């Protein structure tokens, strides 16, 4: 704090701002919107989302708070945030891309260790080690961006970063329960490279066409929306895994019938392995339990695979938005 106070100073346009007042009404509605939204996102999946009355009420209050906040910022004399920056094309599309990017980044960082621990028996330490290649990818991309951004341009750097991130999601979509840490490393490395290649130039590119006196406000708006995007992304993937798991389970259960030769053969094989310790009826029941547990495991695995593929789709969909952003500085 002492170093910051000593070394940092406010720019001239900030020093000229006098008599700045806090928009208490806007701050109240902002707090109401975000607090209710965060509770809904944190507890929604556990409470069956809109099957719960209190989730519905909190969602309604959050929507009302968000709408009132927007109205207060547009109509107020001293708004908490100046939303006119969203009229800037670079800032608007840059913020949209960053919101989605933060959602993908935080969501993937959340579900990968969970998958490794719950489905593959990894310890917390090993699941943490699995994220090391992502850090290495971030480091490599940081060096690469610094060296080549002036040669290829920010827009191309962001575009190819999102494409690489998408291929990382597709690579995660090929996982199975027999993979090793090495198999996790390559997709994670791609995620790290893609995120940094896209995020670092995008921050500068999105604010390039704004005036100096708009930068502080724009940074606040952008960071707020990125945090909301990260919270929504983390919450959505939890729901996606739950819903996709149920969907795949329902699809697979239809194959567990005596009309399916593969099921019958595997059932008999398991039953014969158990019959030496019990009677045939009990052995058959035990064999069915084993097969059903395998079905649950595979349906959950496919839920994770589908979720990772959604990350890839999201990355590919937002990549063309970079082409709508301007190259030149504001004159």
Name every feature range the model reports, one short phrase each.
Residues 1-27, 52:
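Helix-loop-helix hairpins in multi-pass membrane proteins, especially solute transporters
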Residues 97, 221-225:
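Hydrophobic alpha-helical segments of secondary membrane carriers
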Residues 1-6, 67-71, 170-174, 243, ...:
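Membrane-embedded alpha-helical segments of multi-pass transporters/permeases
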Residues 1-5, 30, 58-62, 306-323:
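Symmetry-related core transmembrane helices of the 12-TM Major Facilitator Superfamily/SLC fold
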Residues 22-27, 34, 38-39, 48-217, ...:
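Transmembrane core module of solute transporters
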Residues 41, 116-117, 148-149, 236, ...:
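Interfacial helix-cap and linker-helix signal at transmembrane-aqueous boundaries
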Residues 226-317, 321-324:
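Hydrophobic transmembrane architecture of multi-pass small-molecule transporters
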Residues 1-12, 72-79, 136-137, 250-266:
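Hydrophobic alpha-helical transmembrane segments
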